[in-house]
Amino acid sequence: MSTARWRLVSKASWIARSSQCMCVTTAGQLIVYGGELRPRQPVDSADSSQEGPAVPKPRVGATMVCMDDCLYVWGGRGGVDMAPLDDEQVGVWRAELKTGSDTAEPDGVIWERLSYTDGPEPRSYHAAAATDNDFFIHAGCPTSGRLAQLHKFNIRSRQWEELSSAPAPPRGGTGIVSKNLMSWGRVVLRFGGFSGYELPSVPGTLDLFDPKHDRWYTLQPSPDPIHGYPGARSVCGFAHFESKSPVLSSIVGVLFHGERDASTLGHAGAGTFWDDVWALKKTESNHVVQWAWRKLDVKPADEQGEGESGMPEGRGWFAHAGWQENGTTSVFMHGGLLSSNERSDELWELQIE
């Protein structure tokens, strides 16, 4: 059995939050944006009196991807009524990191609102994944109800394209990853979400989108021989994974934590959360792909670790991002909502061995 090891990287009370977004640049800089410390109150570290070019308003439930060392933010909700932001504010916002004159460390951000026509319906708690010159936006919560739509934005042409909608039910809080498969090419994988109940309703199932044929497929991976399937969940971690290690090379995605049961108070409260880690594995032979779930043995990076420095408490509504170095992916998890209804200030690194 492969092992998932958690390492506490930092604790910073000033950046405690949930419903934020995060990505890692090619230079290894981890960027956190948006979120809330208190329910329905977006956090903002900007000086509200500053003057200059337009910048995005504070928001929760947005997504952010890193492409060509620029950050691309779309979506979210904000304002007093916490409704989805309007067409102008929803984005796409591109952020370029400024560096100091005598250091390579970023000391500011230059924002630009990209112009386009016929963009997706504004929403929050959707999912995003980047690939080559495009990023995908999927599902989420508009002014009312939930969505199943999939859109693609090309950063070169600055054009949106609406693709085939995913299998029902519509959902918020789902997770998607983009992956290149030998027999398929580039695909998008989807797991979980919330549609009045935690998903998937059929244990272990996930959905695959084939961009070449603009078509969705529902997959039923084989279960873990001992633990079966990962439980239904939303607002969880679902991260792309790659490794040159022969033992780990079949792992394409990592699923972890997330909401197990929603709070009766809705967005104002905390439900119950998973604290597990699962590997989604695939093998290919003669152009036939086989999928399997495997539950990982979870341990602290320091075997003697105890308490808060050992392993993270179960949570949901956090930000996560993958980072590849030396041929292996590390997954980072920041903040999130705990069962105590408090927002975490922790940054954790997950490594699989």
Label for each model-derived stretch:
Residues 1-353:
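Kelch-like beta-propeller repeat domains
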